[in-house]
């Protein structure tokens, strides 16, 4: 009997439309590849960080959010968990260099295209 591995994902994103599209992309990618994703949405990074436990395999994080931006949140995340895969989802491509300082695995540019999402996921999940 094959044991199904579930990939636990946190989506830290304040735009509901982006959350819905990311969750659709995860479901679509899972149907295509046989991967199973479980995700939790956090509308802002402070709650995510306050409740953070290293149970996530992957974190999708927006950069521009109120109260705390994604770069600050990523630095705090790395203090708690150095191994979680971190994927920034942003309109701001000029943050790429800073992203490497916090160990970002990938960047997905908004508006999100499924093709871009799938290409990044193929590279991230071996």
Features from the language model and the residues they span:
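Acidic, metal-coordinating helix/loop segments flanking the phosphotransfer/catalytic sites
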Residues: 38-58
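Conserved SAM-binding loop
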Residues: 11, 41, 88-89
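CheY-like receiver
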Residues: 56-126
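Non-catalytic signal-transmission and effector/linker regions of two-component phosphorelay proteins
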Residues: 1-10, 20
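Alpha-helical elements of the RecA-like P-loop NTPase motor core of helicases
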Residues: 20, 50, 97
């Amino acid at each position: 009997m094959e044991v199904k591995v579930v990939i636990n994902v946190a989506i830290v994103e304040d735009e509901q439309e982006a959350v819905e599209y990311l969750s659709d992309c995860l479901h679509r990618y899972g149907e295509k590849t046989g991967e199973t994703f479980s995700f939790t949405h956090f509308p802002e990074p402070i709650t995510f960080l306050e409740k953070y436990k290293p149970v996530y395999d992957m974190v999708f994080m927006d950069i521009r959010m109120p109260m705390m931006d994604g770069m600050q949140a990523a630095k705090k995340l790395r203090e708690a968990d150095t191994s979680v895969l971190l994927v920034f989802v942003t309109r701001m491509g000029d943050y790429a260099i800073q992203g490497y300082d916090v160990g970002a695995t990938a960047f997905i540019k908004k508006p999100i295209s499924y093709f871009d999402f799938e290409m990044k996921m193929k590279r991230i999940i071996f």
